[in-house]
């Protein structure tokens, strides 16, 4: 009798995706210096049309996707955002609108509600209007955001406030908590900047010091206790001050896929920064084939690609080696241990880099923009 074929390791099994990040457009009225979009932004002329997005959603539902995050850029800049939202509802997909709340967002909100929108995630750059508008690069944005948030709660939609934290607004963490309560939000994300995309370019302008980070964590933990049952507060700490890396996107190719405005499918926001990866487009391949067969998703899925110390670490199926894009940017090799991990030989250097930049006077922001040739000030610096 032939011996039974051994079951594959759980790390090698390709799970069904849970979430789809639908980057409907890169157009956005805000110009945030920490934007996670790539430096080379897709133009409107390259965006997928309505029928392509409806097909993507249908295929996503067939794959087992549960949540669709309608994002951008500013997703309400799309004239077909209501139709796309209605398709999510028709397919039973939980829809989360990730929005700046400015421009045409308020004018479309009631129609989105009628179409079956499930949840709204509103970005707030600061509590003080002048500071918020300096960070976002758009005057008179704050009153629009407050009007938008008020209408969200009037409609009975669950509201999450998203506050990306950096040295320019870290002093406002208590104010973000108070604002979330005032607006009737169900959830607040206190998300320290993750240094990819435009945030990597602006790292020296955005990096807070360790004492500020520790104090912000203390404030959040106290507020969690005080507001238990009223407000859920999610906290994302900066990798540069962490002990262990986070499981980027829940693990490469394990939970989430990101479809760009032109239909390129990525395992994470910044995956395009890794040279040599072959990305497939929804215009050429079915979404299911991309998830299971595309070279980019296979490249760092599971644990087989890992080097030491990740390969033998008991955390390898918890954080999946951390962020591949950060490993590349800071060590020169995407397969290296993420230096956010205390087990990385470069961890101390990463901490020192953060300490040095936080101690310097911050340079001016390089604002996110389409069609501008951005010179990355870090491009001439050697990795750690």
Curated annotation (Swiss-Prot):
Domain Radical SAM core as annotated: residue spans: 14-226
Cofactor(s) the protein requires to work: [4Fe-4S] cluster
Function description: Catalyzes the cross-linking of a glutamate residue and a tyrosine residue in the PqqA protein as part of the biosynthesis of pyrroloquinoline quinone (PQQ).
MF annotations from Gene Ontology: 4 iron, 4 sulfur cluster binding; cyclase activity; iron ion binding; oxidoreductase activity; S-adenosyl-L-methionine binding
Family, similarity comment: Belongs to the radical SAM superfamily. PqqE family.
Name of the featured protein: PqqA peptide cyclase
CDD domains xref list: Radical_SAM (cd01335), SPASM_PqqE (cd21119)
Entry EC no(s): 1.21.98.4
Subunit-structure text: Interacts with PqqD. The interaction is necessary for activity of PqqE.
Top enzyme class: oxidoreductase
One Pfam family it belongs to: SPASM
Catalytic activity as recorded in UniProt: [PQQ precursor protein] + S-adenosyl-L-methionine = E-Y cross-linked-[PQQ precursor protein] + 5'-deoxyadenosine + L-methionine + H(+)
Example GO BP: pyrroloquinoline quinone biosynthetic process
Organism: Methylorubrum populi (strain ATCC BAA-705 / NCIMB 13946 / BJ001) (Methylobacterium populi)
Keyword field contains Oxidoreductase: yes
HAMAP family: PqqE
Pathway: Cofactor biosynthesis; pyrroloquinoline quinone biosynthesis
Cofactor note: Binds 1 [4Fe-4S] cluster. The cluster is coordinated with 3 cysteines and an exchangeable S-adenosyl-L-methionine.
Binding residue positions for [4Fe-4S] cluster: 28, 32, 35
Record key words, sorted: 4Fe-4S, Iron, Iron-sulfur, Metal-binding, Oxidoreductase, PQQ biosynthesis, S-adenosyl-L-methionine
NCBIfam families: PQQ_syn_pqqE, rSAM_more_4Fe4S
